[in-house]
């Protein structure tokens, strides 16, 4: 497929690359599956949501007169002409549910909040972020939306009705007057646009640029109106489904419309996300350790200037292929207590970098050290002067590790003891014994591996894949121990000379302990940038 695309004359155009990136992200994020899940959620929660809306409007006597008007506006803007029959059923259900007890009303509020939480989770998955705020904070935020939203909407309709009733605005001059029907449609469309923009800007836990949210909101609002118009025409001319479903014909049409709507809404989330990523430069993806140090260097520089660092600034130091991992990197820096979040949602330095070495920082991460091929790419695309010092030390560390590990595997296995077959009775081997056996195995591995990553709840070690879009989950069982942990475990079993292991480990520690993180970043101004002529890897 890629070979065919390269033959297209517009293959290198920016707009085509953006579309490829957008469609690829939508497929990779299982957009259609998320839309199907949200369709099912909407089907179960649409009556409770509308009931809550009507209950809040009924609680204010001044807004009682605009209940029916608001319901009609919602149905006409969100449903095509063929779905208005379903809207009558939904409205009847909501009217009957308005006479609930306090417990029933509370259950409706809980259902509404759970629906909004499900939508928020889908948006956050597209933005590659986790739920950072506590449950109480989210509940308070959504409770505010649920209660104030209908009140603001009802007040707007009251003001609109009052303006239309003014006598001087209804007078005709030379046969011309104000076409209120046209302006009502314009205002309704403007409210739809504002709703989509607010959705894309407010719901994700990431700080979405307002410009990108506005572009996505306008596109989705216009496409939504076109889709609603087209869907209504198709369904009105395609009547054979009524012969199949009979009285239930409105239900599959309604489900299909909700499914298409959620696909479009999630596509808008992808547009805002892709616009944010596409604004960065497309560079070769660096080793995660180098990306983390680059982010930490930015926070350190801003801290020295008495400033904090925003999420947008942290994302700006990453390349296009590195950006999908930015939130994971951010969590690593926070878990290592190197940075902390301010009340405004920005980040400042938390720990004195003179008191932490590169080796100590590396031991908290689930990544192996960079290898020569990755360092060659860094030297060719060096953007920060402190990399010159870092690359030299990594090259020396890899050279020494290669010397210590240059031993045939057959020679290692020659020291292994013959295995004895152990028969275990499944009737005697209980679940408690299995748990104890797993605990013993995990504690043995943790002693020779990275204790900070295993015991503090950090992510398991994973092999670095520069082309991977998202890092493996923290629950992944395919963890790989760092080379020194493997050798240490082998030395404990007697398969490798323990003196060789100690020598290798101590040498690596000394190489990285010589440089504190503050001393490393201080080379930004003094150390020269490595060029192709003085590359130590050549």
From Swiss-Prot:
<keyword id="KW-1003">Cell membrane</keyword>
<keyword id="KW-0472">Membrane</keyword>
<keyword id="KW-0812">Transmembrane</keyword>
<dbReference type="InterPro" id="IPR023679">
    <property type="entry name" value="UPF0761_bac"/>
</dbReference>
<dbReference type="InterPro" id="IPR017039">
    <property type="entry name" value="Virul_fac_BrkB"/>
</dbReference>
<feature type="transmembrane region" description="Helical">
    <location>
        <begin position="43"/>
        <end position="63"/>
    </location>
</feature>
<feature type="compositionally biased region" description="Low complexity">
    <location>
        <begin position="482"/>
        <end position="493"/>
    </location>
</feature>
<feature type="transmembrane region" description="Helical">
    <location>
        <begin position="247"/>
        <end position="267"/>
    </location>
</feature>
<feature type="transmembrane region" description="Helical">
    <location>
        <begin position="100"/>
        <end position="120"/>
    </location>
</feature>
<feature type="transmembrane region" description="Helical">
    <location>
        <begin position="143"/>
        <end position="163"/>
    </location>
</feature>
<feature type="transmembrane region" description="Helical">
    <location>
        <begin position="215"/>
        <end position="235"/>
    </location>
</feature>
<feature type="transmembrane region" description="Helical">
    <location>
        <begin position="183"/>
        <end position="203"/>
    </location>
</feature>
<feature type="region of interest" description="Disordered">
    <location>
        <begin position="427"/>
        <end position="538"/>
    </location>
</feature>
<feature type="compositionally biased region" description="Basic and acidic residues">
    <location>
        <begin position="503"/>
        <end position="514"/>
    </location>
</feature>
<dbReference type="Pfam" id="PF03631">
    <property type="entry name" value="Virul_fac_BrkB"/>
</dbReference>
<keyword id="KW-1133">Transmembrane helix</keyword>
<protein>
    <recommendedName>
        <fullName>UPF0761 membrane protein PsycPRwf_0630</fullName>
    </recommendedName>
</protein>
<dbReference type="GO" id="GO:0005886">
    <property type="term" value="C:plasma membrane"/>
</dbReference>
<keyword id="KW-0997">Cell inner membrane</keyword>
<comment type="similarity">
    <text>Belongs to the UPF0761 family.</text>
</comment>
